Swiss-Prot record:
Record localization: Secreted
GO CC term, one of those recorded: apoplast
UniProt source species: Arabidopsis thaliana (Mouse-ear cress)
Keyword field: Disulfide bond, Hormone, Secreted, Signal
Molecular function, one GO term: hormone activity
Job of this protein: Cell signaling peptide that may regulate plant stress, growth, and development. Mediates a rapid alkalinization of extracellular space by mediating a transient increase in the cytoplasmic Ca(2+) concentration leading to a calcium-dependent signaling events through a cell surface receptor and a concomitant activation of some intracellular mitogen-activated protein kinases.
GO process annotations (BP): calcium-mediated signaling; cell-cell signaling; regulation of growth
Main subcellular localisation: secreted
Organism lineage: Eukaryota, Viridiplantae, Streptophyta, Embryophyta, Tracheophyta
Disulfide bonds: C37-C46, C66-C72
A Pfam family: RALF
Protein name per UniProt: Protein RALF-like 30
Signal peptide: 1-22
Amino acid sequence: MKAWVICLMVISIFMMIEPTLAAGGGKFLNPGVLDPCLRPNPPPECQAPGSAGKPRERVNEYKVGCSKLTRCDRVG
């Protein structure tokens, strides 16, 4: 009796799986999902989209030094 129940369960499982295998084979991850440059907060070595081949530009020239206002006093 137990053998018939197990056999019936195996046959029913194969009948449920067959339409999904025939329809599309299965679902696969897009390779872009695993790319760390496409995730939020990419690492520094990743380039922004559309910036390939362009030279890097200096964004902010920060000059460390004293001014008349702060008199070389650093608060920190």
